[in-house]
Amino acid sequence: MLEGGVVSRKRRKRILKLAKGYYGAKHLLFRTAKEQVMNSYYYAYRDRRQKKRDFRKLWITRINAAARMNGLSYSQLMHGLKLAEIEVNRKMLADLAVNDAAAFTALADAAKAKLAK
């Protein structure tokens, strides 16, 4: 009777290698390691999507803070930019807000001018 020792050992080694660095028994025992590796794959999949949401939230927070320093709310700024037909994404706006205040102020002034009309 063959028990597939080579195949089983290879499978277990692969899982334990993936579990390297995990805390406690999760990197030593096959069953707990396998469970943790499965969870890790789930967390990685979930958080790749979460990261996009988190960055968008961060950009909006930064844009809002800079917009308020220029006398506008976030929504007013975005609406004004849309009316002015200035297409700049939130990532770039947030970068300008942090690294180039003068350029952000120019965009905010353009948005204000369109909102005033």
Curated annotation (Swiss-Prot):
Residues annotated as transmembrane: none
Molecular function per GO: rRNA binding; structural constituent of ribosome
Pfam families associated with the record: Ribosomal_L20 (PF00453)
Gene Ontology annotations of biological process type: ribosomal large subunit assembly; translation
UniProt xrefs under PROSITE patterns: RIBOSOMAL_L20 (PS00937)
Keywords: Ribonucleoprotein, Ribosomal protein, RNA-binding, rRNA-binding
CDD domains attached to this UniProt entry: Ribosomal_L20
rRNA-binding among keywords: yes
GO cellular component: ribonucleoprotein complex; ribosome
NCBIfam families assigned: rplT_bact
Function noted in UniProt: Binds directly to 23S ribosomal RNA and is necessary for the in vitro assembly process of the 50S ribosomal subunit. It is not involved in the protein synthesizing functions of that subunit.
Family designation: Belongs to the bacterial ribosomal protein bL20 family.
HAMAP family for this protein: Ribosomal_bL20
Protein name according to UniProt: Large ribosomal subunit protein bL20
Lineage, broadest ranks: Bacteria, Bacillati, Bacillota, Bacilli, Lactobacillales
